[in-house]
Structures are given as C-alpha cells and as structure tokens.
Amino acid sequence: MRNPLGLRFSTGHALLASALAPPCIIAFLETRYWWAGIALASLGVIVATVTFYGRRITGWVAAVYAWLRRRRRPPDSSSEPVVGATVKPGDHVAVRWQGEFLVAVIELIPRPFTPTVIVDGQAHTDDMLDTGLVEELLSVHCPDLEADIVSAGYRVGNTAAPDVVSLYQQVIGTDPAPANRRTWIVLRADPERTRKSAQRRDEGVAGLARYLVASATRIADRLASHGVDAVCGRSFDDYDHATDIGFVREKWSMIKGRDAYTAAYAAPGGPDVWWSARADHTITRVRVAPGMAPQSTVLLTTADKPKTPRGFARLFGGQRPALQGQHLVANRHCQLPIGSAGVLVGETVNRCPVYMPFDDVDIALNLGDAQTFTQFVVRAAAAGAMVTVGPQFEEFARLIGAHIGQEVKVAWPNATTYLGPHPGIDRVILRHNVIGTPRHRQLPIRRVSPPEESRYQMALPK
C-alpha cells in the first residue's frame, strides 16, 4: 500500500514559510493566546512541506480549480498534419501542432519472430528500446527537443467469444505479455526553446518545421544504427487510432469514454508492472529530455468503472492533462518492449511461459497436430485475431467466434497467418515441443494444456 503522505522541499515555499513564521509568532506573543502564533507557524511549515498523494495542500486547491474550469470544455484537438520534405529526396515527415508544441512521430518497427519469455513476472525479449539511448541521441543531435515514447495496445482482444477470452485471461494470468502493442516516439518542439536552432533554417514556423523534420530523420537514422528499426511517420493516423479512448467527459478520478472508462495512473514499477494490469486497452507514455529524469504515466481503459491495480496510484484531478501528456510523474530509465508479445505457444523446461508475435509479418504456419491447431487458433482468437476456418469446422467456429471461408487463416490488424502452405512468404513450424522460425530454427518448448481447452478440440470434425 502506497503511503499517501510525503515531504517535498522547495526554495520558494521555504522562503515564504520562513518569512511568515516570525510575524505570526510576534503578533500573538503579548497576548494570552501566545500559542496561536506557534500553531500558525507550524501550520505554515506543514502546508509548505507535507504532500498528500504527491501534492501540497496548495497544489490540491490549484488542481480542483483547474479541473472545475476545464471539465465542461471539450479537449483541445491537434491541428491538421502537414507533410514536409527533408534534404533527402522522397523522405517525408508529418508535423502538426499539439497544444503549444510542434510534434512529429517516429514509428518503431517490431523485429519479426522475436519471442518473449516471462521469468518471475518479468518479460525478457530482444525487441527493446532503452530510454537512456533516446536521451543520449537527443543530447547529441537536438538538445532543445524532448521525446515521448508512447506504447499502445491490449493484453487480450475482444473479437472472440467471451468464454474464449475469459479462458485465455486465466491462462496468461498477470504475465506482462500484451497480444498487441505498437510503439512510437513523439518528438516535441517548443517554439521558444528551439528558436535559435529553427532560425538557422528559416524564419518563423517554417524554420521550426524544418528543424523538427530534420531532427526526426536524424533520430530515426541513429536508432537504426543501434539496431532499432525506426521510420518517420508520414501521417498521424495510426498513432491517433491506437491512442484514441473515445473521450466524452473528464471526471475527478477517470475519463468517461463512449463505451468505456479510462483512468490515468503513476506506476513506478516500469513496463512489467504496466502491462501486467488487466485492461481492455493500455497506453504508456515515457517522456525523455536531455538532463532531466524520465517521466511517465499509464492509462488503463476498462468496460467497467476502474479499480486501482496493485502498484498503481491514481492521478486524481489530472486525468485529462495525463492523457495529453501534461501531467507526468518522475520515474527512471528503463528498457521498453517495442512490439507485441503475441500468443502463448508453450513454456521452457523451467516452466517459464513463451510468447511469439504473429501480427507483424505474413507467414505460413505449419501446425503439428490437432491439439496444437486447437490451442493456437483458440488463443489467437482470444488475442484479437479474426479467425477463418473451413466449412467442416462449423461447430468449432461457433464456439470460438470464428468465420467460415475457403481459406484457413488468422487475420491480425497488420498481418495474416495462413494455416497451411502459401507461396511467397516465410514458413513457421509449431509443434508440441518446438517452434521453428526463419530467425530461430529450433526453439525448444513444452506444451501448456489447461483442461478447459479440451472442449474446443472435441468440437473438431472427426
């Protein structure tokens, strides 16, 4: 349980308290209520130094006032994006105004066939971005910019039958293994801070846009040289779609959406804590700026009114600012997973769950037997894929919420997994004891077989 009380020292509050304390004591010194002056001075020290859930009393008053002012207003929308060319022919980067900042987006491309292994509640994968690397690149190439590393996704999907989704949630438990996740770096340029750098390229907004575009291109190139595939965004469509929560109204402790609720939290535990919390949609934001400690916030969207997960702290009175990246909490540098963890395919000999993503590249999947076929299709449906099976699987399709078609496949938002031979694409083999990919020829695994999944195998045609 987090202790709601804390201490915070600042020069301004200390000077104000030290200036007011002596007059308060002197004013009551010659009266019969001499103790009142000491009490007022002590109260001033408490107001200046003691915090309650991260804010002083004055901070809570300001938060309530700000919330009352904005709660009736719709959120400010971003400007229409403009695409500007850099000095490299054909390399376009979209920029737009977001509040007082001009922003550009860099999408991080997941590394195909990268498994995630969960060991003692921690996700181990090669597909990672070090926030310290981003700060280093900013310091070298554009020290007057700041970057938001934004990841959005979900642990389980909502396209399958409810029983299938519920069963898969029980199987994966609290593993920090989202079925779907995409990551972007949003570069933010403050016109005042970047004035000198922008004026070297052009006057006014044109110079600022050119500086931001050139910086985004340079950061993407440097990330690629460090093994992180990054592409400058030509539009904000994918980013906006992934981070949309259907905002309707801000409340004191949550945001009411069109058909769900979203709550903003501080969670110092890092991505393993953030992605282990049950939610229909998760958005994480880590802000990095040269010479400053990273700041972060987490937004969890649920169908019902949210309950604060263990290790999280609700940002009362600051829900909309957290959504817009204006209310972040100090954190530390960490390794952020880039792509999806994917579907549970088995476990190691030490009983550590193994997940494999299938949503980033088209493949032809060869499944070893009926049980492996059943487990993969059921779990893929629970992970948010649209499953299509043949007409002979009608009963099976009805149980899991699949479609009937001539081609057996699993359709992800950005890729398709064909359950059989398919020309022109990579081939993956999944057996009860091994998974083979173009990257890992033979990755030993053991089957994970919860008894509840057997009912779906019984629905297969004999």
UniProtKB/Swiss-Prot annotation:
Disulfide bonds: none annotated. It holds the Pfam family EccE. It comes from the Bacteria. The keyword rRNA-binding does not apply. It is found in: Cell inner membrane. The chain crosses the membrane at residues 9-29, 34-54. Keywords: Cell inner membrane, Cell membrane, Membrane, Transmembrane, Transmembrane helix, Transport. The keyword ATP-binding does not apply. It is a multi-pass membrane protein. Belongs to the EccE family. Part of the ESX-1 specialized secretion system, which delivers several virulence factors to host cells during infection, including the key virulence factors EsxA (ESAT-6) and EsxB (CFP-10). Part of the ESX-1 / type VII secretion system (T7SS), which is composed of cytosolic and membrane components. The ESX-1 membrane complex is composed of EccB1, EccCa1, EccCb1, EccD1 and EccE1. Interacts with EspD. It comes from Mycobacterium tuberculosis (strain ATCC 25618 / H37Rv). This is ESX-1 secretion system protein EccE1. Its main location: membrane. Was identified as a high-confidence drug target. GO terms for cellular component: plasma membrane. The gene is eccE1.
